[in-house]
Curated annotation (Swiss-Prot):
Its EC number is 1.14.-.-. This is tRNA uridine(34) hydroxylase. The active site is at C192 (cysteine persulfide intermediate). It catalyses: uridine(34) in tRNA + AH2 + O2 = 5-hydroxyuridine(34) in tRNA + A + H2O. It comes from Prochlorococcus marinus (strain MIT 9313). It comes from the Bacteria.
């Protein structure tokens, strides 16, 4: 596996975002838990890897050699061609710690019986995505959470306004089914950050009787890699679940930061408001917490700032 990039330098950390829906036994999972933790410690990797009977989902950050070592170990237990991988770069470590966890699901929808490794929608490559979503007969759905959609989306996409992926099935039954019946679109197209949520969402829709269901292979991050900004249909930045908070179309850290009180992404304008106190409150949560909470948040922020100066 060649993970080198002629635009990178030794000063940058490599970030690998990956997933695979593949059937694993408990023996395989136990071996991977041991081996991945050892590799993370050996190479000083940071990030999170989730393992389940349905596959693997993770984002890790570290040196090129360290990231390569962990990915090669994973791929030894994967079927070739079923490993979705995106690489980006950051000048600072994107995570604070390294975790490998055994989970019931690698992306939690909360439903038993779904098997994306067997039943899944039609993959659409990034270079074909514009033609698909430009078609007025395509119903475009964002499968991410509401706070992610708030800072960037494909133009014309439906926002289910979910707080977590567990909410998606209820939205399908309460709103999407009647929407499809009324609009009779030729097809449904879905997308997410890296491809894993929209892939599982297509499996769910097909199980529930929906037809002509498509999803963006590799998600928004793959689209950023392969589609030029001049041709892009993307508006805004893409939220990511690490210290970078958001990425722009060049896959570089964007302008958003995170409110460590409520977890909402904040624009530069949000950060200039009188209601904003770093780590304590923002416009989204100014009336949400008690004075006791704010005292605790302020102390946590002080400790974080002290740690970052070391």
């Amino acid at each position: 596996m060649n993970l080198q990039d002629d635009q990178t330098s030794a000063d940058l950390f490599q970030v690998a975002t990956f997933y695979s829906f593949t059937a694993w036994t408990e023996v395989t999972i136990a071996c991977l838990l041991h081996d991945l933790l050892s590799l993370g410690d050996e190479h000083q990797l940071m990030g999170t890897v989730l393992l389940a009977e349905e596959g693997v989902n993770g984002t890790i950050c570290g040196s090129v050699d360290g990231v390569s070592a962990l990915l090669e170990r994973l791929e030894s237990d994967l079927i070739e061609g079923l490993f979705e991988l995106k690489i980006s770069w950051t000048p600072e470590q994107a995570f604070r710690r390294f975790k490998v966890r055994r989970k019931a699901e690698i992306v939690t929808m909360g439903l038993a019986g779904l098997n994306p490794s067997k039943t899944v929608g039609t993959y659409v490559d990034a270079h074909e995505w514009n033609d698909l979503i430009d078609d007025p007969d395509t119903l475009l759905i964002d499968t991410r959470n509401d706070y992610e959609v708030a800072i960037g989306e494909f133009k014309g996409a439906i926002n289910p306004q979910t707080k977590c992926f567990r909410d998606f099935p209820a939205w399908v039954e309460q709103q999407l089914r009647s929407m499809v019946k009324a609009q009779t679109p030729a097809r449904i197209a879905m997308y997410c950050t890296g491809g894993i949520r929209c892939e599982k969402a297509t499996s769910y829709l097909i199980e529930k009787g929906f037809t002509n269901v498509h999803h963006l292979r590799g998600g928004i991050l793959r689209y950023f890699e392969e589609v030029s900004q001049t041709e892009s249909r993307w508006q805004g930045e893409c939220f990511v679940f690490d210290q970078r908070v958001a990425l722009n179309h060049q896959l570089s850290p964007g302008v958003h930061c995170l409110c460590h009180a409520c977890g909402m992404p904040l624009t530069p304008e949000d950060q200039t408001m009188n209601s904003y106190l770093p780590g304590v409150q923002c416009r989204h949560c100014v009336d949400q917490f008690s004075d006791t909470d704010r005292i605790r948040f302020a102390e946590r922020q002080r400790q974080m700032e002290h740690s970052s100066r070391k």
